Every structure is written in structure tokens, then in C-alpha cells.
Amino acid sequence: MIASLVHRARNFYDRMQWMETFLPGPVAAVSCLLRARHDPAVLTTGRYHDFAFSFRGCDFSALKEVLVDAEYSFLTDAVKSPRSPVILDVGAHIGLFSLWALHINPVAQIMSVEASPGTFRILERNVRQSQKTGWTAINRAAWKNDDTIRFAEVPDSMSHRVSVTGGTEVKGISLAALTGGCGDIDLMKVDIEGAEEAFLCADPAVLAPVKRLVIELHPQLCDTQRVRDVLQKVFPQIAEIQGRTSSKPLLYCRKQGVSP
């Protein structure tokens, strides 16, 4: 009992410390944590460098992973490199990866794609708050076609996914429809909770204009070996990112001659 209380207190303190990164101080951080415990959907507005952004209690794990632990920091040079890189953020959640990329390169042209209607509302709010005209967002589910599909929403907002038993309907968008008219795509980030097989394997040739792809695989939810096989035919250079907190594989794929 005592050990459990100590563990919970330590976790609360650790979370309060990193939450101060986005809020005015410890009092604001504690207030945010207590309100989120009562209602995980309650909205808080904080700051990430020059950007105001909003988040919920159910988004804490995403905040920690993307902005505190800087999981995508290995992409810094790729985002900095082109003067105005074209980036597709597929499975954008509330837009944290996009915010990170805009901090690295304020003139990046980003399209964020998010399936969950509730999460999309926060994403849309963050796009507006950023005041970046090069950042746009659409409420669609990355899929093998553009049909309407069912979507399951669960307590941890990072784990929403396509599911035949899901209670939410959302229109799909295929890889071809998403990339059509974009020209060269400097970077595509994909984190879509198991839909990566349907999204990428339906028409791999459409990946031709994508210079770099970073993708999280979900072995329990799709045939990730099939995804790997498809990617190896398109991207000669593939590295699995090591040292992650998550056990899910994160692959960084590049075309021949494309710098890291």
C-alpha cells in the first residue's frame, strides 16, 4: 500500500516537472494535472516555444513522447534542410509533431491528417493558434480507399484506430488521394495504429514522390512484415530507430541519395 502511494506520488511529481515546460509554473502544472484527473477531456492551453497550443489530459502521453522526450529529434536536419519542406503528418493526433517541425523550420508546408473527430477539433484549434498559413489539417482516416469507415476511440487518445466495431464513422483517404498534386514530399510521418498496412500496401507506387518516410509499426494490429517488404522495394535505405520507450518499431526510410 505504502509502496503504491510512493510510486503514484513520484509519477505525479515527475509529470508535474515536465508539464512545467508548457505552463507558467508548478502551480499551473498541478492545477492542470488535478483537473485532468477529474476530467481527462478538459482542455488546457500552454506554450511550446513560440506557439500557443491546446491539449487534454488524455493527450499527456503524446506530449511526453513528442515534445518532452523529442522522439523525432533524429529528423531535425531533414526538416531544417529544404528552405520550405513539404511534410505530410498522417495520424497527426493534436498536431504535436507538426508543432515540433514548425519550431525547427517555421516555413515548413504541413498537411496534418487525423481521423478522430474529437481529436481533430483540438488539432484544428492548434492550427489556428499557430497562425501559420502553411499548416493545414483534414479530418480523414488514412486507409486503402476513400470509403467511409468505422473508427474506435479509446481513453488514451494516441490509441484510437480503425475498427469494424468502432462507434464513430469517418471518411477514409487513400495514399493516392492524399499525395496527389503535392509534387515532391520531403517527409511523410505515419502513425495510424495498425492501418499502415491498408494505407501503404494498397498502391506502393504512389510513394514515388516521398523522399523520406518515418513510420511506427503496430505488430499486434496488422501484418507489419508485409509493410516492411513493401517499404524495402521503394526505399533503399531503412533504419530502425533504437532507444525508444515504446516497444513498437519506428522505421526511418529514405530514397537513394537523400540526406538523413
Predicted regions and their residues:
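Phosphate/nucleotide-binding beta-alpha loop and adjacent structural elements of enzyme active sites
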Residues: M1-P260
